[in-house]
Amino acid sequence: MKKICLFIVIFTSLQLKAQSFDEYFTDNTLRIDYIFSGDVNHQQIALDKLNCSPHWYGKHKRLSELPVEGNGQITVRDHKSKAVIYRNSFSTLFQEWLSYDEAKKTSRSFENVFLVPMPKDTVDITIELKNNRRETQVSFTHQVTPGDILIRKIGYNNRTPFVQMLTPKDSTNCIHIAYIAEGYQTSEMPTFINDVKNTMEALFAHEPFKSMKDRFSIVAVEAPSKDSGTSEPSKGIWKNTALSSHFDTFYSDRYLTTLNLKDLHDWLAGIPYEHIIVLVNTNHYGGGGILNSYNLSMAHHRLTRPVVVHEFGHSFAGLADEYAYEAEQIPMYPHDIEPWEENITTLVDFKSKWNDLIKKNTLIPTPTTPANKNKVGVYEGAGYSVKGVYRPMQDCRMRTNENPEFCDVCRRALTKIIDFYTK
């Protein structure tokens, strides 16, 4: 009798979990456009626009769980019951900009776009931004009623042309990635498709992507630009491109990004996507990856393949940079706070990281010696800090472009994320 009751409880629990998406959501995407603005002392979040597009390509399970903590979170609550029915995490260029000196002198605004499943009933949506001490810096809550006549319908007609590059084994439980062309004229789209093939080959040469390839759906979106290439402000070069990308972001010559997130998602409206890889038609070195926002990389440099994979580590799984600068403007990771990223530590709470992968008698910190070259340890120098922040192995795809693979800790983190979305 006890076994029967236990079976009923487990079955009912699983049934409720399976039904939770259909209980609260329709098979459509609610795209919410925000403006984040302010300076180092005061930040503000404002609602810009609401949009609805056909089908939902994000997670259908574990709706109220976060894949990783991130530097910000979006939470959807049922208005009547106050139950949390969807959550996701993210990072933004706005938060990164706040760490630069310019943020001490002036205010700026940044576009941000988030996707959630379209609710069946009224919901309360909260956006939280956190500082580098993992404290909530600013919070904003607003209400969305699905019948609002000002919710703009997009992606139902006149979709951007796209090519299916990879078909998953199970289209109902897969990870949807969209490559999008930036700085490619219409006549250059065959080149773009070849560039997508090249970087896909690089990504799926790395574990765990290689062994879990059948869990991914990939499309190549042929967004045309009037000009070929990308803008280079330091050289006085400005191009008219689909996403208005440019080098010199935050006055860093190799930092290649786009600030036009509404344009990005307009091009993608109605197309199967959740994660985004932007390929920029340039042979100059540069790129950037932002958690659950986008990965943007140059397409025609000798290091394109490792850079695209590295930046996807950021945008897809929230992995931290494992390299260090001799001189950094502001420490990104306070040494008295444990970072949320799984591949770096300050040793404040090392048990929450890769302590279980450390072999007995391993010195902590671990000496950077030839004998320890392939050994999981605690090596000083990571997260842009020479001192006080540590990485799992001497080298990794998240540290250099030369290392051929992700380290053991990063592979585990990536595997966990893939399972999170697909199991």
Residues covered by each model-derived region:
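Active-site-proximal segments of metallohydrolase catalytic domains
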Residues: 215-291
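Catalytic Zn2+-binding segment of zinc metalloproteases
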Residues: 312-328
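Beta-strand-enriched, solvent-exposed domains that form extended recognition/catalytic surfaces
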Residues: 26-150
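Short pre-active-site segment immediately N-terminal to the catalytic Zn-binding motif
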Residues: 189-192, 287-311
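Solvent-exposed loop/turn segments at secondary-structure junctions
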Residues: 183-186, 224-228, 282-286, 302-304, ...
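Fold-level signature of zinc-dependent metallopeptidase catalytic domains
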Residues: 151-207, 220-230
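Bacterial Sec-dependent N-terminal signal peptides
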Residues: 1-22
